[in-house]
Amino acid sequence: MKSRKLLLAILALGLLTTSCYTEVIIDDDFIVESPVNTDQVLQSFDLWYVDINASSADGAVPFLQRAFTVSFDRGVVLANNNIVGIGKTGNGLGIDVGSYATLNGVVEIDHDFDGLWALEVYAVNNTTIELFDPRSRSSYVLRGYQRSNFDYDLVFYDNIDYFLEEYEAWEKTFTSEVGAVNEFDNENFLQFVGGSATFRSSVDAVRTPLVNVQWDYQGTYELFDVANDATLKTLTLDYDFLGNDYFELYVINDSTIELYHVASETVYEFTGRGFIQFAKAEVNTGKMRKKSTRKTMPVTRKRKM
Protein backbone atom coordinates (compact mmCIF):
# COMPACT_ATOMS: atom_id res chain seq x y z
CA MET A 1 0.00 0.00 0.00
CA LYS A 2 1.10 3.56 -0.59
CA SER A 3 2.32 5.23 2.58
CA ARG A 4 1.60 8.77 1.41
CA LYS A 5 -1.87 10.24 1.82
CA LEU A 6 -3.84 10.18 -1.40
CA LEU A 7 -3.72 13.76 -2.65
CA LEU A 8 -4.72 15.41 0.68
CA ALA A 9 -4.86 18.66 -1.24
CA ILE A 10 -1.13 18.17 -1.75
CA LEU A 11 -0.35 20.76 0.88
CA ALA A 12 -2.13 23.30 -1.31
CA LEU A 13 0.69 22.58 -3.84
CA GLY A 14 1.05 26.11 -5.03
CA LEU A 15 -2.67 26.66 -5.41
CA LEU A 16 -2.28 29.96 -3.61
CA THR A 17 0.38 31.15 -6.05
CA THR A 18 -2.08 32.06 -8.78
CA SER A 19 -5.21 34.10 -8.32
CA CYS A 20 -7.29 32.14 -10.80
CA TYR A 21 -7.60 29.12 -8.50
CA THR A 22 -9.91 28.70 -5.53
CA GLU A 23 -8.09 28.64 -2.20
CA VAL A 24 -7.94 25.22 -0.57
CA ILE A 25 -8.17 25.39 3.23
CA ILE A 26 -6.15 22.77 5.08
CA ASP A 27 -7.53 21.71 8.48
CA ASP A 28 -4.61 19.98 10.18
CA ASP A 29 -3.62 17.38 7.57
CA PHE A 30 -7.08 16.33 6.45
CA ILE A 31 -8.98 17.59 3.45
CA VAL A 32 -12.19 16.33 1.96
CA GLU A 33 -11.02 14.97 -1.37
CA SER A 34 -12.95 16.01 -4.45
CA PRO A 35 -12.57 16.03 -8.21
CA VAL A 36 -12.23 19.82 -8.03
CA ASN A 37 -9.29 19.61 -5.65
CA THR A 38 -7.59 17.00 -7.82
CA ASP A 39 -7.97 19.15 -10.92
CA GLN A 40 -6.71 22.24 -9.09
CA VAL A 41 -3.60 20.35 -8.06
CA LEU A 42 -2.92 19.15 -11.60
CA GLN A 43 -3.39 22.66 -12.98
CA SER A 44 -1.41 24.37 -10.23
CA PHE A 45 1.78 24.15 -12.31
CA ASP A 46 2.22 24.88 -16.00
CA LEU A 47 4.42 21.83 -16.51
CA TRP A 48 5.14 18.60 -14.72
CA TYR A 49 8.62 17.24 -15.45
CA VAL A 50 8.54 13.44 -15.63
CA ASP A 51 11.49 12.40 -13.48
CA ILE A 52 12.27 9.00 -14.95
CA ASN A 53 15.29 8.50 -12.69
CA ALA A 54 13.08 8.80 -9.59
CA SER A 55 10.20 6.73 -10.99
CA SER A 56 9.61 3.04 -10.33
CA ALA A 57 8.32 2.20 -13.77
CA ASP A 58 9.74 0.79 -16.98
CA GLY A 59 7.34 1.56 -19.78
CA ALA A 60 4.24 0.61 -17.79
CA VAL A 61 2.42 3.79 -18.84
CA PRO A 62 3.69 4.46 -22.37
CA PHE A 63 2.69 8.12 -22.74
CA LEU A 64 4.42 9.01 -19.45
CA GLN A 65 7.48 6.95 -20.31
CA ARG A 66 8.03 8.86 -23.56
CA ALA A 67 7.22 12.35 -22.23
CA PHE A 68 9.70 14.85 -20.87
CA THR A 69 6.90 17.02 -19.50
CA VAL A 70 3.13 16.78 -19.22
CA SER A 71 0.59 19.53 -18.60
CA PHE A 72 -3.06 19.47 -17.55
CA ASP A 73 -5.00 22.38 -18.99
CA ARG A 74 -8.79 22.49 -18.50
CA GLY A 75 -9.41 18.93 -19.60
CA VAL A 76 -6.60 18.74 -22.16
CA VAL A 77 -3.37 16.76 -21.67
CA LEU A 78 -0.30 18.23 -23.35
CA ALA A 79 3.18 16.71 -23.55
CA ASN A 80 6.69 17.51 -24.67
CA ASN A 81 7.71 14.22 -26.27
CA ASN A 82 10.62 15.66 -28.25
CA ILE A 83 13.79 17.41 -27.17
CA VAL A 84 13.84 19.18 -30.54
CA GLY A 85 11.67 22.26 -30.10
CA ILE A 86 11.26 21.92 -26.34
CA GLY A 87 10.46 25.32 -24.89
CA LYS A 88 8.94 26.48 -28.19
CA THR A 89 6.36 23.88 -29.19
CA GLY A 90 2.94 24.81 -27.85
CA ASN A 91 4.36 27.86 -26.07
CA GLY A 92 6.53 25.50 -24.06
CA LEU A 93 3.79 23.05 -23.11
CA GLY A 94 4.14 20.72 -26.09
CA ILE A 95 1.39 19.11 -28.12
CA ASP A 96 -2.17 17.96 -27.39
CA VAL A 97 -2.04 14.21 -26.72
CA GLY A 98 -5.43 13.54 -25.14
CA SER A 99 -7.99 14.55 -22.55
CA TYR A 100 -8.46 14.04 -18.83
CA ALA A 101 -11.09 14.10 -16.10
CA THR A 102 -10.68 13.92 -12.34
CA LEU A 103 -12.25 11.80 -9.62
CA ASN A 104 -11.48 11.75 -5.90
CA GLY A 105 -7.69 11.57 -5.89
CA VAL A 106 -7.65 10.00 -9.35
CA VAL A 107 -7.02 11.35 -12.82
CA GLU A 108 -8.54 9.53 -15.79
CA ILE A 109 -6.47 10.16 -18.90
CA ASP A 110 -7.80 9.26 -22.34
CA HIS A 111 -4.67 9.27 -24.49
CA ASP A 112 -5.20 9.57 -28.22
CA PHE A 113 -3.36 6.32 -28.94
CA ASP A 114 -2.52 4.70 -25.60
CA GLY A 115 -6.15 4.65 -24.51
CA LEU A 116 -7.78 5.13 -21.11
CA TRP A 117 -5.78 5.14 -17.88
CA ALA A 118 -6.97 5.72 -14.30
CA LEU A 119 -3.99 6.91 -12.25
CA GLU A 120 -4.00 7.61 -8.54
CA VAL A 121 -2.55 10.99 -7.52
CA TYR A 122 -0.29 11.14 -4.45
CA ALA A 123 1.40 14.10 -2.80
CA VAL A 124 5.14 13.84 -2.29
CA ASN A 125 5.84 17.45 -1.30
CA ASN A 126 4.76 20.98 -2.20
CA THR A 127 5.99 20.70 -5.78
CA THR A 128 5.99 16.98 -6.49
CA ILE A 129 3.28 14.42 -7.15
CA GLU A 130 3.30 10.74 -7.94
CA LEU A 131 1.00 9.12 -10.49
CA PHE A 132 0.41 5.49 -9.54
CA ASP A 133 -0.91 2.88 -11.96
CA PRO A 134 -2.67 0.21 -9.86
CA ARG A 135 -2.70 -2.29 -12.72
CA SER A 136 1.09 -2.51 -13.02
CA ARG A 137 1.77 -1.20 -9.50
CA SER A 138 4.27 1.26 -10.93
CA SER A 139 4.60 4.97 -10.33
CA TYR A 140 5.88 8.08 -12.06
CA VAL A 141 7.31 11.04 -10.17
CA LEU A 142 6.27 14.44 -11.58
CA ARG A 143 7.91 17.70 -10.48
CA GLY A 144 5.93 20.90 -10.96
CA TYR A 145 7.21 24.10 -12.58
CA GLN A 146 5.83 27.31 -14.00
CA ARG A 147 7.05 28.14 -17.48
CA SER A 148 8.89 31.16 -16.12
CA ASN A 149 11.17 29.06 -13.89
CA PHE A 150 11.49 25.87 -15.91
CA ASP A 151 15.04 25.32 -17.17
CA TYR A 152 14.45 24.04 -20.70
CA ASP A 153 18.19 24.17 -21.45
CA LEU A 154 19.00 21.91 -18.52
CA VAL A 155 16.40 19.38 -19.65
CA PHE A 156 17.82 19.58 -23.17
CA TYR A 157 21.38 18.78 -22.13
CA ASP A 158 20.30 16.17 -19.59
CA ASN A 159 18.51 14.32 -22.41
CA ILE A 160 20.81 15.11 -25.32
CA ASP A 161 21.07 11.46 -26.37
CA TYR A 162 17.37 11.59 -27.34
CA PHE A 163 18.09 14.74 -29.35
CA LEU A 164 20.57 12.84 -31.53
CA GLU A 165 17.94 10.16 -32.19
CA GLU A 166 15.21 12.60 -33.24
CA TYR A 167 16.51 12.90 -36.80
CA GLU A 168 16.68 10.08 -39.32
CA ALA A 169 20.24 11.14 -40.08
CA TRP A 170 22.76 13.93 -39.58
CA GLU A 171 24.36 15.30 -42.74
CA LYS A 172 27.79 16.92 -42.74
CA THR A 173 27.44 20.51 -43.93
CA PHE A 174 30.81 22.01 -42.97
CA THR A 175 34.41 20.92 -42.41
CA SER A 176 36.97 23.37 -41.08
CA GLU A 177 40.09 24.09 -43.10
CA VAL A 178 42.11 23.87 -39.91
CA GLY A 179 42.85 20.34 -38.79
CA ALA A 180 44.85 17.31 -39.82
CA VAL A 181 43.56 14.97 -42.51
CA ASN A 182 41.81 11.95 -41.01
CA GLU A 183 39.45 9.18 -42.08
CA PHE A 184 36.38 10.88 -40.61
CA ASP A 185 36.78 13.55 -43.30
CA ASN A 186 35.17 11.08 -45.71
CA GLU A 187 32.07 10.33 -43.64
CA ASN A 188 29.15 12.57 -44.59
CA PHE A 189 26.17 11.02 -42.79
CA LEU A 190 25.66 9.80 -39.24
CA GLN A 191 22.66 8.01 -37.79
CA PHE A 192 21.98 7.37 -34.11
CA VAL A 193 19.56 4.48 -33.84
CA GLY A 194 16.76 5.11 -31.36
CA GLY A 195 16.46 2.84 -28.35
CA SER A 196 20.00 1.51 -28.65
CA ALA A 197 23.61 2.65 -28.48
CA THR A 198 24.14 1.90 -32.17
CA PHE A 199 25.35 4.38 -34.77
CA ARG A 200 25.85 4.08 -38.51
CA SER A 201 27.85 6.24 -40.90
CA SER A 202 28.07 6.71 -44.65
CA VAL A 203 30.59 8.08 -47.12
CA ASP A 204 27.85 8.87 -49.65
CA ALA A 205 28.06 12.32 -51.20
CA VAL A 206 26.53 15.28 -49.41
CA ARG A 207 22.92 15.99 -50.51
CA THR A 208 22.24 12.31 -51.23
CA PRO A 209 18.51 11.73 -50.52
CA LEU A 210 18.13 9.91 -47.22
CA VAL A 211 16.25 7.03 -48.83
CA ASN A 212 19.31 6.38 -51.01
CA VAL A 213 21.99 6.60 -48.32
CA GLN A 214 24.03 3.41 -48.01
CA TRP A 215 25.44 2.84 -44.54
CA ASP A 216 29.09 1.84 -44.79
CA TYR A 217 30.08 1.55 -41.15
CA GLN A 218 28.41 0.87 -37.86
CA GLY A 219 29.31 0.46 -34.23
CA THR A 220 28.37 1.65 -30.77
CA TYR A 221 28.45 5.18 -29.44
CA GLU A 222 28.60 6.65 -25.97
CA LEU A 223 27.91 10.14 -24.68
CA PHE A 224 29.62 11.47 -21.57
CA ASP A 225 29.04 14.38 -19.25
CA VAL A 226 32.01 16.59 -18.41
CA ALA A 227 32.66 17.56 -14.81
CA ASN A 228 31.89 21.22 -14.04
CA ASP A 229 30.75 21.92 -17.62
CA ALA A 230 27.00 21.28 -17.97
CA THR A 231 26.74 22.19 -21.67
CA LEU A 232 29.75 20.22 -22.90
CA LYS A 233 29.30 16.59 -23.85
CA THR A 234 31.83 14.21 -25.34
CA LEU A 235 31.02 11.56 -27.93
CA THR A 236 32.89 8.36 -28.70
CA LEU A 237 32.16 6.43 -31.89
CA ASP A 238 33.44 2.88 -31.54
CA TYR A 239 33.47 1.33 -35.02
CA ASP A 240 33.08 -2.41 -35.38
CA PHE A 241 36.62 -3.75 -35.98
CA LEU A 242 37.92 -0.29 -36.99
CA GLY A 243 38.90 1.57 -33.85
CA ASN A 244 37.16 4.67 -32.54
CA ASP A 245 36.83 8.44 -32.88
CA TYR A 246 36.50 10.89 -29.99
CA PHE A 247 34.72 14.25 -30.25
CA GLU A 248 33.56 17.18 -28.22
CA LEU A 249 29.88 17.73 -29.01
CA TYR A 250 28.47 21.26 -29.30
CA VAL A 251 24.82 22.07 -29.96
CA ILE A 252 24.32 25.10 -32.23
CA ASN A 253 20.53 24.98 -32.45
CA ASP A 254 17.64 22.51 -32.65
CA SER A 255 18.91 21.06 -35.92
CA THR A 256 22.66 21.70 -35.96
CA ILE A 257 25.56 20.21 -34.03
CA GLU A 258 29.32 20.60 -34.20
CA LEU A 259 31.71 17.73 -33.62
CA TYR A 260 35.25 18.72 -32.68
CA HIS A 261 37.60 15.87 -33.54
CA VAL A 262 40.14 16.21 -30.75
CA ALA A 263 42.91 14.13 -32.34
CA SER A 264 42.97 16.11 -35.61
CA GLU A 265 41.62 19.43 -34.24
CA THR A 266 39.02 19.47 -37.03
CA VAL A 267 35.53 20.96 -36.61
CA TYR A 268 32.63 19.30 -38.42
CA GLU A 269 29.11 20.70 -38.62
CA PHE A 270 26.16 18.35 -39.06
CA THR A 271 22.55 19.25 -39.81
CA GLY A 272 19.63 17.04 -38.85
CA ARG A 273 17.61 15.56 -41.71
CA GLY A 274 14.21 13.88 -41.40
CA PHE A 275 12.84 15.10 -38.07
CA ILE A 276 11.00 12.34 -36.18
CA GLN A 277 8.13 13.78 -34.14
CA PHE A 278 7.24 11.53 -31.23
CA ALA A 279 3.74 12.87 -31.14
CA LYS A 280 0.59 10.82 -31.15
CA ALA A 281 1.06 8.37 -33.98
CA GLU A 282 1.21 4.69 -33.15
CA VAL A 283 4.32 4.32 -35.28
CA ASN A 284 6.19 6.47 -32.76
CA THR A 285 5.38 4.50 -29.63
CA GLY A 286 8.74 2.71 -29.75
CA LYS A 287 10.58 5.70 -28.25
CA MET A 288 10.77 5.31 -24.48
CA ARG A 289 12.89 7.17 -21.97
CA LYS A 290 15.16 5.15 -19.69
CA LYS A 291 16.92 5.89 -16.44
CA SER A 292 20.12 7.78 -17.17
CA THR A 293 23.35 5.82 -16.89
CA ARG A 294 25.57 8.44 -18.50
CA LYS A 295 29.07 8.59 -17.06
CA THR A 296 31.15 11.68 -16.32
CA MET A 297 34.45 11.94 -18.14
CA PRO A 298 37.34 13.59 -16.25
CA VAL A 299 38.47 15.81 -19.13
CA THR A 300 38.66 19.51 -19.92
CA ARG A 301 37.51 21.34 -23.02
CA LYS A 302 40.15 21.03 -25.76
CA ARG A 303 38.62 23.17 -28.46
CA LYS A 304 39.89 26.73 -28.55
CA MET A 305 36.81 28.91 -28.87
Region locations from a protein language model:
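Positively charged n-region of N-terminal signal peptides that target proteins for export
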Residues: 1-5, 22
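Long, hydrophobic/aromatic-enriched structural stretches that serve as scaffold segments
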Residues: 4, 102-105
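Sec-dependent N-terminal signal peptides
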Residues: 6-12
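C-terminal motif of bacterial Sec signal peptides marking the signal peptidase cleavage site
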Residues: 16-19
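Lipid interaction determinants
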Residues: 21-97, 104-220, 224-305
